C-alpha cells in the first residue's frame, strides 16, 4: 500500500492544486466584477440623485427663468461694453452698429415688425395699448441714480410690510424735466394728428359731437362697404 502511494506521479499531485487555483481565479474574477457593478450602481444612484435635485431646482424657478437669465447676461455684457467704450473714448452706439451685420439688422427689423405690427385702427383700447407699449419701450432708466438711491436707503430700499418708505420718494428735477418734455412731445404729436377740420354745412349730420363724428368716419372707412346695402334699403324703406 505504501509502495502504491510512493509511485504517484508529480502530475497527479499537482492536478488538485491547479483545479483549486482555477476555481480561486474564477471566484476572484466574479468578486472583482461584482465590485465593479456595485461601484457603477452607486455612481448611477449618485448621478440620479443629483439630477433629481437639479430638476427640483429648475421646477421651483419661474417659468421664464431661462429667458430672464439670458436677458440679464446680455444686459451685463452690454454694460461692460459701454464702460469699455467710455474708457476708450468711443461712441457706444456707433461701436454697436459696427458689430451688427446687414443680415442681422434686417432680421431684427422684421422681428420688431412682427412683435408690434401696425394693423391699422381697430378700437380705442387697442390704440391706447399700442401707444403704451411704444412709450414704455422708450423709457431709459438711469442706473447711476438707481444705484445711488439703493446705497442711500440701505435696507429700506427693499421695504417689507412694516416699512414706512413707500410714498416718501421724491423724484429728481432731471426726472421731472424728462417727463415734462415727453408729455409736451406727445401733446405736439397729438395736435398734428387731430387738426380741426372745417365743417361742411351741406353734409348729413349723423353724429352727436365731434368725437362721435370722428368715430363714425372711421367706422365708415372700415365697414362702409359691408353696410352700404343696408343703408340703401333703410333709406328706400325696403328694409325687412
Swiss-Prot record:
GO terms for cellular component: catalytic step 2 spliceosome; nucleus; post-mRNA release spliceosomal complex; Prp19 complex; U2-type catalytic step 2 spliceosome. Its main location: nucleus. Residues 63-91 form a coiled coil. InterPro entries: mRNA_splic_SYF2 (IPR013260). Residues 1-25 are annotated as: Disordered. It is found in: Nucleus. GO terms for biological process: mRNA splicing, via spliceosome. The keyword Nucleus applies. It holds the Pfam family SYF2. Identified in the spliceosome C complex. Belongs to the SYF2 family. This is Pre-mRNA-splicing factor syf2. The gene is syf2.
Amino acid at each position: 500500500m505504501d509502495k502504491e502511494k510512493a509511485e504517484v506521479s508529480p502530475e497527479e499531485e499537482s492536478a488538485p492544486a491547479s483545479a483549486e487555483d482555477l476555481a480561486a481565479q474564477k471566484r476572484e474574477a466574479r468578486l472583482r466584477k461584482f465590485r465593479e457593478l456595485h461601484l457603477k450602481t452607486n455612481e448611477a444612484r449618485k448621478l440620479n440623485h443629483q439630477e433629481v435635485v437639479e430638476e427640483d431646482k429648475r421646477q421651483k424657478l419661474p417659468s421664464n427663468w431661462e429667458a430672464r437669465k439670458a436677458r440679464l447676461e446680455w444686459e451685463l455684457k452690454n454694460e461692460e461694453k459701454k464702460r469699455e467704450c467710455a474708457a476708450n473714448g468711443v461712441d457706444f452706439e456707433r461701436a454697436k452698429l459696427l458689430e451688427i451685420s446687414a443680415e442681422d439688422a434686417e432680421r431684427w427689423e422684421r422681428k420688431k415688425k412682427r412683435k408690434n405690427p401696425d394693423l391699422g385702427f381697430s378700437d380705442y383700447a387697442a390704440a391706447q395699448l399700442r401707444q403704451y407699449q411704444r412709450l414704455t419701450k422708450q423709457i431709459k432708466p438711469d442706473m447711476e441714480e438707481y444705484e445711488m438711491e439703493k446705497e442711500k436707503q440701505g435696507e429700506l430700499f427693499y421695504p417689507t410690510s412694516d416699512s414706512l418708505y413707500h410714498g416718501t420718494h421724491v423724484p429728481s428735477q432731471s426726472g421731472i424735466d424728462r417727463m415734462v418734455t415727453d408729455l409736451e412731445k406727445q401733446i405736439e404729436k397729438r395736435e398734428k394728428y387731430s387738426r380741426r377740420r372745417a365743417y361742411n354745412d351741406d353734409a348729413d349730420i349723423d353724429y352727436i359731437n365731434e368725437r362721435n363724428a370722428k368715430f363714425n368716419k372711421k367706422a365708415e372707412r372700415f365697414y362702409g362697404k359691408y353696410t352700404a346695402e343696408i343703408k340703401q334699403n333703410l333709406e328706400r324703406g325696403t328694409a325687412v
